[in-house]
């Protein structure tokens, strides 16, 4: 492929990458009745009369230019027609399985019935950001409910009871405490409910007749206790939940995280990754060689940016009917400018690195680390990272006039993140959306123009040419 970026105003000082991905999706994963459509009968009388699911073009507008179906090659701006939607279903399934952050984003629709499908369920989607200190944060310390330490279920309470005879507060009284099999004598007591001299008065044991100090305690000698095995179980369940959070809970991720086995995509009935590649987008400075009346002097810098790539293909033998889809996306390095590095917030001894504490649970990442405001919101938890993650990763940052808040900012020379409000660990945050509009001269136009060439070499069980009459020579 050859790619040209919309004209940058300046030769931006940042890294841009163009990446490609190819996947195959068996038709049976996106249409439940595909095998019956091909002639399979589970019972002798089963019907094989099925039609491929369709998606009607939106009324009035048809499929618009730049839509997903435009990239599939469907005619645009024409309504009142329909086409089969196996490509759209495969696209959404690939997104769900390979590009969606399962902790922050809901699955998109993947119809598997006989249709018709709704075109608005199938739109262009943004990939997730590459993982760094912030984008790899978890929204919770473990993926599951917090595991409680099993301390038992109950402990008897002494000092509360009900009397069955009449007493006053200066005399001792016989009372029945929780689950008691015999009466207990309170030397001093106070009434809580009921009247002195009345039956079934609720009584609280006191320390002396002349004061109101209460003598109410939980009797831990008779409390139920947890066993060592129950405590071990609590620790191991917590470890499982933490591994689910770190490793993911798609089935293939569970197998890899818990059992150390990487299962082929096809065996787990999911889209299969075939290959791809990554290459840099090169930004070329262009120096003005003559002065103009508009005030730009000689040597004023503009730029153009291009990228080319080769050998991003794949070789694959298919053993069933599949759709093959290729994806191209552009990403930039993630650079920050509004946060206070965690290292600059450390105050106590235990906040420093200690080997003995290296394997504790996930630690909180605070909002001020990515977006400092000088308010109470700074201490809101943004997400959770592994213990001492700040020692393992150093986010890139910018300073000086490159900062977006400088009155004479040069931020159009960079692609650094600039948050207009406090970011949260959410679907919007995790989507890859580099601020390319900030650095190009025409932000309302497409950011990249691509010329893609695919060299198909197919080996198929079909004759080279269809010759009339050769019906018995397949």
Language-model segments: which ranges?
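Intrinsically disordered, low-complexity segments
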Residues: 1-474
């Amino acid at each position: 492929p050859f790619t040209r970026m919309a004209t940058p105003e300046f030769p931006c000082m940042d890294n841009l990458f163009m990446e490609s991905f190819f996947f195959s999706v068996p038709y049976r994963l996106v249409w439940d009745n595909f095998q019956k459509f091909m002639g399979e009968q589970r019972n002798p009388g089963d019907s094989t009369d099925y039609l491929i699911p369709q998606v009607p073009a939106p009324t009035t507008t048809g499929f618009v230019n730049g839509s997903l179906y435009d990239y599939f090659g469907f005619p645009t701006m024409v309504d009142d027609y329909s086409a089969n939607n196996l490509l759209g279903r495969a696209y959404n399934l690939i997104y769900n399985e390979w590009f969606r952050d399962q902790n922050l984003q809901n699955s998109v629709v993947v119809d598997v019935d006989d249709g018709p499908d709704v075109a608005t369920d199938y739109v262009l989607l943004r990939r997730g950001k590459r993982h760094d200190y912030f984008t790899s944060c978890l929204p919770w310390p473990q993926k599951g409910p917090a595991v409680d330490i099993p301390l038992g279920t109950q402990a008897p309470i002494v000092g509360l009871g009900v009397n069955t005879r009449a007493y006053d507060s200066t005399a001792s009284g016989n009372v029945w405490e929780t689950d008691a099999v015999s009466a207990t004598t309170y030397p001093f007591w106070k009434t809580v409910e009921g009247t002195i001299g009345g039956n079934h008065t609720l009584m609280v044991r006191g320390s002396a007749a002349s004061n109101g100090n209460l003598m109410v305690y939980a009797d831990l000698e008779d409390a139920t206790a947890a066993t060592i095995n129950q405590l071990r179980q609590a620790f191991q369940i917590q470890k499982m939940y933490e591994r689910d959070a770190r490793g993911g809970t798609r089935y293939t991720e569970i197998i890899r995280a818990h059992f150390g086995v990487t299962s082929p995509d096809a065996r787990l009935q999911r889209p299969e990754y075939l290959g791809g590649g990554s290459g840099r987008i090169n930004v070329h400075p262009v120096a003005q060689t003559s002065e103009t009346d508009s005030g730009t002097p000689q040597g004023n810098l503009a730029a153009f940016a291009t990228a080319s790539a080769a050998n991003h293909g794949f070789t694959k033998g298919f053993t069933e009917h599949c759709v093959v889809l290729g994806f191209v996306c552009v990403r930039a390095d993630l650079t920050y400018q509004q946060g206070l590095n965690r290292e600059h917030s450390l105050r106590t001894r235990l906040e420093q690195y200690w080997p003995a504490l290296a394997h504790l649970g996930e630690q909180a990442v605070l909002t001020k680390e990515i977006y400092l405001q000088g308010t109470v919101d700074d201490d809101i938890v943004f997400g959770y990272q592994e213990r001492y993650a700040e020692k393992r990763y150093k986010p890139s940052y910018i300073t000086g006039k490159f900062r977006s808040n400088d009155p004479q900012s040069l931020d159009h020379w960079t692609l650094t993140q600039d948050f207009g409000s406090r970011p949260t660990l959410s679907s919007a945050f995790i989507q890859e959306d580099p601020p390319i509009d900030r650095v190009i001269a025409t932000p309302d136009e497409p950011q990249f123009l691509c010329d893609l060439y695919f060299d198909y070499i197919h080996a198929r069980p079909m004759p080279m040419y269809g010759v009339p009459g050769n019906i018995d020579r397949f």
